[in-house]
A protein has these predicted regions:
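Active-site acid/base region of carbohydrate-active enzymes
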Residues: 303-326, 347-348, 384, 388-391, ...
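Terminal accessory carbohydrate-recognition/targeting modules of carbohydrate-active enzymes
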Residues: 50-313, 317-320, 362, 670-777
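Alpha-helical junction/boundary sensor with strong preference for TPR arrays
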Residues: 377-380, 400, 424, 465, ...
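Secretory targeting and sorting signals
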Residues: 22-49
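Carbohydrate-active enzyme catalytic cores, enriched for enzymes
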Residues: 166-167, 462-468, 476-561, 636-770, ...
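Active-site core of glycosidic bond-cleaving carbohydrate-active enzymes
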Residues: 346-367, 371-379, 386, 407, ...
């Protein structure tokens, strides 16, 4: 995929593991072929052998029937025909409509198309973090309930067998109840399964701690009902060779080599634990131990999320996704992924995560990411990375007002500024030097995306240094930004081509005479253009309401940039070198699309992206994503595949999209904050009868903002706690057919735009404000 600039793998992912990973990957691939073949043939797999299934097929119940042609047509089209279908609905885009169009994501694919797990299913990364600094332990719980792995997908682990003791739990998708999270978002995995003999199982698992054991511990509770099965249920928990001592079981289990066996007639509840590091443990993980550990996990995450901003909307799936993704972001921190070769610092993506977690009130995570990026930048320097660091540092100060953080990173940022000044003072036109297009494309270019990011970062840090009474650094950064801006605008104008449809094509590599792409995903270069151009649009270099930005956006919309509101990509690492129509999505790069959509006030497109992500960019009910995802399933599979999940980038994109729908800062021509727009891009159903939207403590450049919108009948009541802000606006996006009719504040009329539902607060409005809004047909 595009991969923004990224750093080398962290400790624990070093070259000494490479040969072992290669051998393990070959074994995993071979085993997965057996498993997938069993699924296609209508059988479950257990202990390497194909077991007869009680049902004629073990495929997922989801089918392409009636959808295959529509998906093919959508992939071949240059417009977002699926998105346009949802936008044309009277209610606008909804999750229910979006989920019917795309297959659920299920399979985790690595390099060379190899599955990451034995069953091919994705895994969830569970952690019990004590600090966002330094290495962390991770437990990888496979989504079908079949396995738990230690730290890496090829690490030691625990496998669950049921039925006659040889049927892998979850191996028949037709008999697997889809995975969910406890309370909708907690890192506690729940699945259900029926084996080939008719016994039924309900499994819950999570990662936590046991007093006296320093290691992270995974806990499993398995409820078994074999009362109506054809014979006893034989449940086996089997550890990897040489790791049997890490498996702890309750008193009912019988040791059997490196595993534990239960033979059940009737019903039973089983408790086992998997210790992820060597430890002297003689604890029996009974129900009391399990409940205590689970309670601690619940309290940990309740407390962690309570410290940040809360966005409460009248759509539980969106709230669950928000909370689950915040858990993931706090756990992964700077990591692009966990448990696979993508566990690394990827600069642009990690720094986007830092900006978004700061906006959600989790500044400890944001600071950890920024400080690591600053520390690693000298050895991995590119101008794009430097620009991303400048933008993130300025954003963190803007949202937290943490002067101490700026003081800590200013020496490193001064070195960056000196390096940029040296390039800009050269004999050239005022552009920065050529550098690799991205970490995946090493061709040296004058990258508009990287240089626009530097321009944005220089101006942002100039404002920070000015506010902190450092006029010398502020003046130097301003000079560098202005010189770069003049050269960038001139180079962009010289490279721009106007197409017959009135749209504009601006190449990402300036001066290289790139021609417009008829279909962006038909070529590697076009696909990469589509992934990096959002950095330009989000930087503010081009006025989001101006002809250049709108012309580029029109070009993107007519040449295959989006599908169901998601960023399209060639996805060659998933599909291989197939036909151009076999493209996927790469929503990691949707974060900057969302920023542009908010700046350009395109609310319906932002809503489309929100639901597109829930339906097609992450797993349903568990909210795991990869760097890229298929649209049409691979080969004989009915379900979608992801590349090297989990991935923090798509999580960042969803959280930013949700935040921008509810709280958006307007910016001036040079990026300085100029006003607040509240609830400007919400789904219209969020103001249906009886609905309430609540935002608490959202960080902004002007200070925290909180508000409540509550509709009862033909009245919407607004309660707002606003900081001092130059201009303050609120929008009520009502269901189709309803309009704002009158607005009063303390008995006085307030100006509003009936067409858009936008309310303009009087100049100087601040503090506690209350509105009464009358609505009607």
């Amino acid at each position: 995929m595009a991969r923004g600039p990224h750093d080398a793998s962290p400790p624990g992912s070093t070259e000494r593991h490479a040969r072992r990973r290669g051998r393990r990957a070959r074994r995993v691939a071979a085993a997965a072929v057996v498993t997938l073949a069993a699924l296609v043939a209508g059988a479950g797999a257990g202990n390497g052998a194909v077991r007869p299934a009680a049902t004629p097929t073990c495929h997922s119940a989801w089918t392409l029937a009636g959808r295959g042609a529509a998906l093919h047509d959508a992939l071949a089209a240059r417009r977002d025909v699926l998105g346009e279908r949802l936008l044309a609905m009277r209610r606008g885009p909804t999750y229910a409509a979006a989920r019917r169009l795309l297959p659920p994501l299920w399979y985790a694919v690595g390099h060379g198309g190899r599955p990451l797990t034995l069953s091919g299913a994705y895994y969830l990364p569970f952690a019990y973090p004590f600090t966002v600094y330094g290495p962390q332990a991770f437990a990888l719980h496979v989504a079908d309930g079949s396995e738990i792995r230690t730290r890496r997908a090829d690490g030691p682990g625990l496998t669950v067998f049921v039925g006659d003791g040889r049927e892998r739990y979850g191996s028949c998708l037709a008999r697997l109840r889809p995975p969910r999270l406890a309370r909708g978002w907690l890192p506690v995995l729940r699945t259900g399964y029926a084996d080939a003999r008719g016994a039924r199982y309900a499994q819950e698992s999570f990662a936590g701690r046991i007093p006296g054991i320093r290691s992270l511990v995974s806990f499993v509770r398995l409820r078994v009902d074999a009362a109506h099965a054809r014979g006893a249920a034989v449940v086996r928990f089997v550890a990897s060779p040489g790791f049997g001592a890490r498996l702890l079981a309750d008193a009912a289990g019988e040791r059997d080599g490196r595993g534990v066996v239960y033979r059940i007639r009737g019903t039973a509840v089983i408790h086992v634990a998997w210790v992820h590091a060597r430890a002297n443990a003689d604890i029996v993980p009974d129900g009391a131990v399990y409940d205590a550990a689970r309670g601690a996990v619940s309290r940990l995450w309740d407390n962690a999320l309570a410290r940040g901003t809360t966005f409460e909307v009248p759509e539980q799936r969106v709230v669950d996704a928000e909370r689950s993704l915040l858990v993931q972001q706090r756990s992964l921190a700077w990591r692009y992924s966990v448990g696979n070769p993508y566990e690394e610092l990827s600069f642009a993506e990690a720094l986007d995560a830092a900006r978004v977690t700061a906006a959600y009130g989790h500044a400890d995570v944001s600071e950890a990411i920024l400080r690591l990026a600053v520390r690693r930048l000298p050895a991995r320097y590119t101008n794009w990375r430097a620009g991303a660091v400048l933008v993130a540092a300025a954003d963190l100060f803007r949202l937290t007002r943490d002067r101490a953080l700026v003081d800590r990173v200013t020496p490193a940022l001064t070195t960056v500024l000196r390096r940029l000044e040296h390039q800009l003072r050269g004999a050239g036109p005022g552009l920065l030097d050529r550098e690799p297009f991205s970490s995946d494309v090493t061709r040296p270019v004058i990258g508009l995306h990287g240089q626009a990011t530097v321009w944005q970062g220089l101006l942002a840090m100039a404002r920070v240094w000015s506010r902190l009474d450092d006029p010398r650094l502020a003046a130097r950064a301003t000079w560098a930004a202005e010189r770069l801006e003049r050269a960038l605008r001139q180079a962009a104008r010289a490279s721009t081509r106007r197409l017959a449809d009135g749209s504009l094509f601006v190449p990402a590599a300036l001066g290289d005479r790139a021609r417009p792409y008829a279909a962006l995903t038909a070529s590697r270069d076009g696909s990469y253009w589509n992934l990096v151009m959002p950095y330009v649009l989000a930087s503010g270099l081009f006025d989001p309401d101006g002809p250049t930005a709108r012309g580029i956006w029109r070009y993107m919309g007519a040449h295959g940039s989006r599908l169901l509101g998601l960023v399209r990509a060639r996805a060659g690492r998933l599909y291989g070198r197939g036909p151009s129509a076999a493209s996927g999505v790469d929503q990691v790069y949707g974060v900057n699309v969302a920023r542009f959509l908010a700046d350009a006030d395109l609310p319906d497109q932002l809503v489309l992206s929100l639901y597109g992500m829930l339906a097609g960019a992450m797993t349903r009910d568990t909210f795991v994503s990869g760097e890229a995802a298929t649209v049409a399933p691979l080969r004989a599979a009915r379900l979608g595949s992801m590349y090297l999940p989990p991935n923090s980038g798509t999580s960042t994109a969803f959280l930013e999209t949700l935040r921008l729908a509810l709280v958006h800062e307007r910016r001036g021509p040079r990026g300085a904050p100029s006003g607040l727009d509240l609830a400007f891009s919400t789904p219209r159903a969020w103001l249906r009868e009886g609905a309430t939207i609540r935002v608490t403590g959202a960080s902004t450049s002007f200070g925290p903002v909180s508000y409540v919108l509550s509709r009862r009948g033909d009245i919407v009541r607004v309660g707002l706690d606003a900081p001092p802000v130059p201009t303050l606006r609120l929008r009520l996006r009502l269901p189709a057919g309803m309009h704002v009719r009158r607005v009063t504040m303390s008995g006085r009329a307030v100006a509003f735009d009936a067409a858009s539902g936008t309310i303009r607060f009087p100049p100087g409005a601040r503090g506690t404000l209350e509105l009464v809004v009358g609505i009607g047909p």
